[in-house]
């Protein structure tokens, strides 16, 4: 046992000595195997085999590839930002003018100093790119400013001028509406002054409501000059409206010459004043002596042929045309004893009796002369 062990030990020592001495000697097959191993390590097939052997887990490589990808992305983003900055900015800005200033510009530049709504919008669109892009969103604003501001006047289109829409122009009194001719600053809101003639006509129209209303034959239409109508004093018998408080019945009439001469005068001649005073005293005594029972109003009481009369009849001048047309008869007219029979026909308001009619009732039993 000792010999074999010693012999084996000597053999092993000899092999080790030889291998150490002949380290540079190429052993048969060792070099080729080493080359094959190196090639297998470098080949991708061997790499995949190693991945399979490790259970599908790939050995992580160096982060050199990911860093290059991040650098590429950063460069592309920088290029995009530079491209955006190099693009020209939008130069369309809203003009600093109000709609009133824009309308005034367009009207002043026109040869006739008047434009339609479409012409105003066309001028604004051609002059300002901002409104050209926003059209027609602002067209209603132009229309409202034209209608609501007194500085713009609407002119109807002429019959021989075909087209659509009315013309608009500037009020001559609104020339100094902008400060120093600058359209950027407006002094104050322009308000058109009401004309004096218009105010006078409005006052006359309001006063004419009532007795002399617009519906009456003597009513004056609004807008016409008062001189176009004949004054009531020029008529033979002024018009008496059927309104107002009533006077005592059976008012005697004055001569037509006196009515014409003293149509609206508050004073009468001395002779007429004496006549009126005597008639008033006579009428007062007659009214006191009248019986309390009065007959009803009827045509027989007005147009009667009875000659019986308690008081001597008193004649007067011919009645107005209105009474003559109502009583078309050639027979003599005899008034009734009742004062209420003739009252509604000859009653007039108190505001028209000055200088025209007597203030008291004096013809309770008067008779008109035959025609």
Swiss-Prot record:
Assigned GO CC terms: nucleus
Database matches in SUPFAM superfamilies: Winged helix' DNA-binding domain (SSF46785)
Main localization category: nucleus
GO biological process: anatomical structure morphogenesis; cell differentiation; negative regulation of DNA-templated transcription; negative regulation of neurogenesis; nervous system development; neural crest cell fate commitment; positive regulation of neurogenesis; regulation of transcription by RNA polymerase II
Ranges of compositional bias, category Basic and acidic residues: 34-51
Entry keywords, A to Z: Developmental protein, Differentiation, DNA-binding, Neurogenesis, Nucleus, Repressor, Transcription, Transcription regulation
Biased amino acid composition, Acidic residues: 21-33
Renumbered residue ranges of the record's region tle4-binding: 297-303
Induction (free text): By dorsal wnt signaling. Inhibited by bmp signaling.
Region of interest (Disordered), residue spans: 1-90
A GO molecular function held by the record: RNA polymerase II cis-regulatory region sequence-specific DNA binding
Subcellular location: Nucleus
Biased composition (Low complexity): 1-13, 75-85
Tissue specificity remark: Initially located within the dorsal blastopore lip (Spemann organizer) at the mid-gastrula stage. As expression fades in the neuroectoderm, expression begins in the head mesoderm in two regions at the lateral borders of the presumptive neural plate. These regions correspond to neural crest cells originating from the mesencephalon (anterior) and the rhombencephalon (posterior; rhombomeres 2, 4 and 6). Subsequently expressed within trunk premigratory neural crest cells.
Residues of the DNA-binding region: 94-188
Pfam families for this protein: Forkhead (PF00250)
Domain commentary: The C-terminus is required for transcriptional repression and mesoderm induction.
Quaternary structure, from the entry: Interacts with tle4.
Primary role: Transcriptional repressor that is an essential upstream regulator of neural crest determination and mesoderm induction. Functions by recruiting the transcriptional corepressor tle4. Also acts in a negative auto-regulator loop by inhibiting the transcription of its own gene.
PANTHER family associated with the record: FORKHEAD BOX PROTEIN, FORKHEAD BOX PROTEIN D4-LIKE 1
Name recorded for this polypeptide: Forkhead box protein D3-B
Organism: Xenopus laevis
């Amino acid at each position: 046992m000792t010999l074999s062990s010693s012999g084996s030990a000597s053999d092993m020592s000899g092999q080790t000595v030889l291998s150490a001495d002949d380290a540079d000697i190429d052993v048969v097959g060792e070099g080729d195997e080493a080359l094959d191993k190196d090639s297998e390590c470098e080949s991708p097939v061997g790499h995949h085999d190693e991945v399979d052997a490790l259970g599908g887990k790939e050995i992580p490589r160096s982060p050199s590839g990911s860093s290059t990808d991040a650098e590429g992305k950063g460069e592309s983003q920088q290029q995009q930002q530079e491209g955006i900055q190099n693009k020209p900015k939008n130069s369309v800005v809203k003009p600093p003018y109000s709609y009133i200033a824009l309308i005034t510009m367009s009207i002043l530049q026109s040869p006739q100093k008047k434009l339609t709504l479409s012409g105003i919008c066309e001028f604004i669109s051609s002059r300002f790119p901002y409104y050209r892009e926003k059209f027609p969103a602002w067209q209603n604003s132009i229309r409202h400013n034209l209608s609501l501001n007194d500085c713009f006047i609407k002119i109807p289109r002429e019959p021989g001028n075909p087209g659509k829409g009315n013309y608009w122009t500037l009020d001559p009194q609104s020339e100094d509406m902008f400060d120093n001719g600058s359209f950027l600053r407006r002094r104050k809101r322009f308000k058109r002054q009401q004309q004096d003639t218009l105010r006078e006509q409005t006052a006359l129209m309001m006063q004419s409501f009532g007795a002399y209303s617009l519906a009456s034959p003597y009513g004056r239409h609004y807008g016409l000059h008062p001189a176009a109508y004949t004054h009531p004093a020029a008529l033979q018998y002024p018009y008496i409206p059927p309104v107002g408080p009533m006077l005592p019945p059976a008012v005697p009439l004055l001569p037509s010459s006196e009515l014409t001469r003293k149509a609206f005068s508050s004073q009468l001649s001395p002779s007429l004043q004496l006549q009126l005073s005597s008639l008033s005293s006579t009428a007062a005594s007659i009214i006191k002596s009248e019986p309390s029972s009065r007959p009803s109003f009827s045509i027989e009481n007005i147009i009667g042929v009875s000659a019986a009369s308690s008081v001597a009849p008193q004649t007067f001048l011919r009645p107005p045309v209105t009474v003559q047309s109502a009583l078309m008869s050639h027979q003599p007219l005899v008034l009734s004893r009742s004062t209420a029979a003739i009252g509604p026909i000859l009653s007039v308001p108190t505001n028209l009796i000055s200088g025209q009619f007597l203030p008291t009732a004096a013809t309770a039993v008067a008779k008109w002369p035959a025609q």
